[in-house]
């Protein structure tokens, strides 16, 4: 079982809970999510299964899209509705549209103190829960779009298109700071993560093997190189072969269309970075025999 499942994460569970549920349902250990969603958030959560976990590092870090709701009037210590208020109720002071425009573009964003960001090797949220002072370093992010969808004071619905690593909770908090009234996130739904759309997402309790996106399709922007039988053996062993391709990375296939490896391309050489099948399985299929020693990538 290899590929990616696009899960519509329900509210109230962690991204790790989703991973554990898939491990239990399908009886497979190699499972990992591609981009964390907070427990309060719902929506698109890509989950790599089997061999897909090995090539996740090569999946393009593409923009993400969200829809959500912000409550103006006071801030919370978690920057969302799960937290404790940190300020008294105050009215909006300033122009909302101008404040949103100021939070669009390239930003040095400070993550929430209740986040998985590491401080001295420990997740920030663990320190924050002990009431220890948490000084978060700013992270460079890009907010391509921050648009109002509706406004019924004190609530505003919005849409955001942003780079991976952007904290929408921080965006809500910073907007409240600019308006002098405080604000926090009350709901969030991820509608797109890279090429994965909410229309593709499947409820966790309904997901099946038929929902798997094949491993090779995840890397379709990469060039495809088809190799001879002789070069196939070299690739399965992790050895380099010659090529005329000049892209940084390529997908390697054999003559039968089997996805063999992801490789770096350097100075006319294809150097396998992740080999997806062992030489043993190839020889077993070809000769009907089992080698005593399996050669893995």
What are these regions, as identified by a protein language model?
Residues 47, 68, 121, 171, ...:
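Residue-level signal for inorganic ion chemistry
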Residues 1-10, 14-37, 41-44, 100, ...:
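Accessory RNA 3′-end/elbow-binding domains used by RNA modification enzymes
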Residues 79-82, 110-139:
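Glycine- and acidic-residue-rich catalytic/RNA-contacting loop of pseudouridine synthases
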């Amino acid at each position: 079982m290899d590929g990616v499942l696009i899960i519509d994460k329900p509210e109230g569970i962690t991204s790790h809970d989703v991973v554990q549920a898939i491990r239990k349902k399908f009886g497979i250990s190699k499972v990992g999510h591609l981009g964390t969603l907070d427990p309060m958030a719902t929506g698109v959560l890509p989950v790599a299964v089997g061999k897909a976990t090995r090539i996740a590092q090569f999946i393009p870090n593409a923009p993400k899209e969200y829809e959500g709701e912000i409550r103006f009037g006071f801030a919370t210590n978690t920057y969302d509705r799960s937290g404790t208020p940190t300020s008294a109720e105050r009215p909006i002071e300033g122009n909302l549209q101008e404040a949103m425009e100021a939070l669009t573009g390239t930003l040095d964003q400070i993550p929430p103190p209740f986040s998985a960001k590491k401080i001295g090797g420990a997740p920030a949220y663990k320190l924050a829960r002990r009431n220890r002072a948490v000084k978060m370093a700013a992270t460079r992010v890009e907010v391509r779009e921050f648009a109002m969808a509706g406004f019924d004071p004190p609530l505003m619905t919005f849409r955001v298109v942003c780079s991976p690593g952007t904290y929408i909770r921080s965006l809500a908090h910073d907007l409240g700071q600019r308006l002098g009234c405080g604000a926090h996130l009350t709901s969030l739904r991820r509608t797109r993560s890279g090429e994965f759309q909410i229309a593709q997402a499947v409820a966790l309790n309904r997901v099946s093997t038929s929902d798997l996106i094949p491993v090779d399709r995840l890397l379709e922007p990469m060039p495809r190189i088809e190799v001879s039988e002789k070069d196939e053996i070299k690739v399965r062993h992790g050895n380099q072969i010659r090529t005329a391709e000049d892209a940084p990375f390529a997908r390697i296939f054999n003559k039968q269309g089997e996805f063999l490896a992801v490789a770096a391309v350097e100075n006319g050489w294809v150097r396998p970075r992740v080999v997806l099948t062992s030489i043993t399985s190839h020889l077993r299929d070809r000769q009907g025999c089992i080698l005593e020693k399996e050669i893995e990538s």
